[in-house]
Swiss-Prot record:
<feature type="domain" description="AB hydrolase-1">
    <location>
        <begin position="74"/>
        <end position="383"/>
    </location>
</feature>
<comment type="similarity">
    <text>Belongs to the AB hydrolase superfamily. MetX family.</text>
</comment>
<feature type="binding site">
    <location>
        <position position="377"/>
    </location>
    <ligand>
        <name>substrate</name>
    </ligand>
</feature>
<dbReference type="GO" id="GO:0008899">
    <property type="term" value="F:homoserine O-succinyltransferase activity"/>
</dbReference>
<dbReference type="Pfam" id="PF00561">
    <property type="entry name" value="Abhydrolase_1"/>
</dbReference>
<feature type="region of interest" description="Disordered">
    <location>
        <begin position="1"/>
        <end position="31"/>
    </location>
</feature>
<keyword id="KW-0963">Cytoplasm</keyword>
<feature type="site" description="Important for acyl-CoA specificity">
    <location>
        <position position="345"/>
    </location>
</feature>
<keyword id="KW-0012">Acyltransferase</keyword>
<keyword id="KW-0808">Transferase</keyword>
<keyword id="KW-0486">Methionine biosynthesis</keyword>
<dbReference type="GO" id="GO:0004414">
    <property type="term" value="F:homoserine O-acetyltransferase activity"/>
</dbReference>
<protein>
    <recommendedName>
        <fullName>Homoserine O-succinyltransferase</fullName>
        <ecNumber>2.3.1.46</ecNumber>
    </recommendedName>
</protein>
<feature type="binding site">
    <location>
        <position position="248"/>
    </location>
    <ligand>
        <name>substrate</name>
    </ligand>
</feature>
<dbReference type="InterPro" id="IPR000073">
    <property type="entry name" value="AB_hydrolase_1"/>
</dbReference>
<feature type="active site" description="Nucleophile">
    <location>
        <position position="178"/>
    </location>
</feature>
<feature type="compositionally biased region" description="Low complexity">
    <location>
        <begin position="7"/>
        <end position="26"/>
    </location>
</feature>
Length: 403
């Protein structure tokens, strides 16, 4: 573990607190990276954004695991998905375990005995990096609706500045699942000389019309909440929880497979018999309401709007008349692409589309399609075949760089 300069104002990750187990530091398993403390990195230089504006002065929350070698060649960047953060692995003092702790740690597929792993919380998030909840430099009040719309490309440019701070010229690998996979892909396109390997898990080179539609319905639920106040609800000391609940319920349905939902809930009733009401009747309804309530307590509505819109906008083929083959022609990285058979949010066909474009350009690609019942969320879960594939790939990287 590298020593970090700690900002006492850095908060724990509520996403991890809500969705992952807690472990008192004294009972941590031996394959944990242990107790971790995030670092707040401040950047004074303005960051040009894709929308033509710029962000003047911003913070990024960062966590690191493992040790950066003398050559600075063993660094791995982990990019997070919608509601995750910089807290990838290990445990915070409050007991929150990192969102990909089963993947990153000593002896794990991404082995911190060999690699220096970095997690960065993206701009616009609500877990410490500059976002809608942060004070606007001119007013001192939260940005709210004035926070600029950001894109995957903006996040990658910000992450590149983190790499510069560490003196990392090239990552051994950039890795992510779902939206994190889009960032990993974008890294290989925007900074081809800085990415040795690109690991894209349960992701897609662009959203389908159906996925954009899901995001629009979720955003509409938030925007129509009377407590939204045009995005400036902080001043009213309220939160659009009703909209956030519905948005999360919609999203959560897409993260699970039909098989998984059938096995977990089926048509099981909450009570012994139907009650002929519009209250909760089925266990699956109870589960969705629970997930919605939990999410609304810790997540920020403006952040949800920003991140789902960034998902919508990502389409590297757009600048090449829709040709993904042309879009990836200048990449230099080797790739590992992983999909899951029951993932209908980002179906295997989308991963195969990326693989084909890379093969058309004679890029080295390893592709794994894992037969797993858990839908899109499978990328977060511990599956022996999935982890064996990732472990073998990182073993190859370690041998290449002598880690």
């Amino acid at each position: 573990m590298t020593e970090l300069q700690v900002d006492p104002a850095a908060s724990a990750d509520p996403a991890a607190a809500a969705d992952t187990p807690r472990h008192p530091a004294a009972t941590l398993p031996p394959d944990s990276v242990g107790l971790v403390v995030p670092e707040r990195m401040h950047f004074a230089e303005p960051l040009p954004l894709r929308n033509g504006s710029q962000l003047v002065g911003y913070d990024l929350m960062v966590e690191t695991y493992g040790t950066l070698n003398a050559e600075r060649s063993n660094a791995v960047l982990i990019c997070h998905a919608l509601n995750a953060s910089h807290h990838v692995a290990g445990v915070h003092a409050e007991g929150e375990v990192g969102w990909w702790d089963n993947m990153v740690g000593p002896g794990k597929p991404v082995d911190t005995n060999r690699f220096f792993v970095i997690g960065v919380n993206n701009l616009g998030s609500c877990f410490g990096s500059t976002g809608p909840m942060s004070p606007h430099p001119q007013t001192g009040q939260p940005y709210g609706a004035r926070f600029p719309v950001v894109t995957v490309e903006d996040w990658v440019n910000a992450q590149a500045r983190v790499a510069d701070r560490f003196g990392i010229r090239q990552f051994a690998a950039v890795m992510g699942g779902s939206l994190g996979g889009m960032q990993a892909l974008a890294w290989s396109l925007m900074y081809p000389e800085r990415v040795r390997h690109c690991v894209v898990v349960a992701s897609t080179p662009k959203l389908s019309a159906q996925n954009i539609a899901f995001n629009e319905v979720a955003r509409s639920a938030i925007l129509s909440d009377p407590d939204f106040h045009g995005g400036d609800y902080y001043a009213h000391n309220v939160k659009p929880k009703r909209g956030l609940r519905v948005a999360r319920m919609i999203g959560h349905i897409t993260y699970l497979s039909d098989e998984d939902m059938a096995e977990k809930f089926g048509r099981e009733l909450k009570a012994e018999d139907i009650r002929f009401s519009f209250d909760v009747e089925f266990q699956v309804e109870s589960y969705l309401r629970y997930q919605g309530d939990k999410f609304a307590e810790y997540f920020d509505a403006n952040t949800y709007l920003l991140i789902t819109r960034a998902l919508d906008y990502f389409d590297p083929a757009l600048a090449y008349e829709g040709s993904l083959t042309r879009a990836v022609a200048h990449t230099r990285a080797s790739y590992l692409v992983v999909s899951f058979t029951t993932d209908w949010r980002f179906a295997p066909a989308r991963s195969r589309e990326l693989v084909k474009a890379l093969l058309d350009n004679k890029r080295p690609v390893t592709y794994g399609e894992i037969d797993a019942p858990h839908g899109h969320d499978a990328f977060l879960l511990e599956d022996a075949r999935y982890h064996a594939l990732v472990r073998a790939y990182y073993e190859r990287i370690a041998q290449e760089i002598g880690a």
